[in-house]
Amino acid sequence: MSDIAERVKKIVIDHLGVDAEKVSEGASFIDDLGADSLDTVELVMAFEEEFGVEIPDDAADSILTVGDAVKFIEKAQA
């Protein structure tokens, strides 16, 4: 797992209070990890702060899984 993926995973664990083994790249924030819409907004804000990237609302709406977040952040930092 890349450094970005590890940091995303830590943020998800901290914000959602889920077990580390549940957090995989294919895990859906809502369907698999029990997040609600407010949780997803807070996760996006945490990703922006941690990685120094801006995630526009339309992009945030397409970040549905841990892997989606990692891919967006990797692309934004490239």
UniProtKB/Swiss-Prot annotation:
GO terms for cellular component: cytosol; membrane. Pathway: Lipid metabolism; fatty acid biosynthesis. It comes from the Bacteria. Carrier of the growing fatty acid chain in fatty acid biosynthesis. The lineage of its organism: Bacteria, Pseudomonadati, Pseudomonadota, Alphaproteobacteria, Hyphomicrobiales. Belongs to the acyl carrier protein (ACP) family. The keyword Cell membrane does not apply. This is Acyl carrier protein AcpP. Signal peptide: none annotated. It is found in: Cytoplasm. Keywords: Cytoplasm, Fatty acid biosynthesis, Fatty acid metabolism, Lipid biosynthesis, Lipid metabolism, Phosphopantetheine, Phosphoprotein. The modification O-(pantetheine 4'-phosphoryl)serine is found at residue 37. One of its GO terms (biological process) is lipid A biosynthetic process. 4'-phosphopantetheine is transferred from CoA to a specific serine of apo-ACP by AcpS. This modification is essential for activity because fatty acids are bound in thioester linkage to the sulfhydryl of the prosthetic group. GO terms for molecular function: acyl binding; acyl carrier activity. Residues 2-77 form the Carrier domain. SUPFAM superfamilies: ACP-like. It comes from Rhizobium meliloti (strain 1021) (Ensifer meliloti). Its main location: cytoplasm.
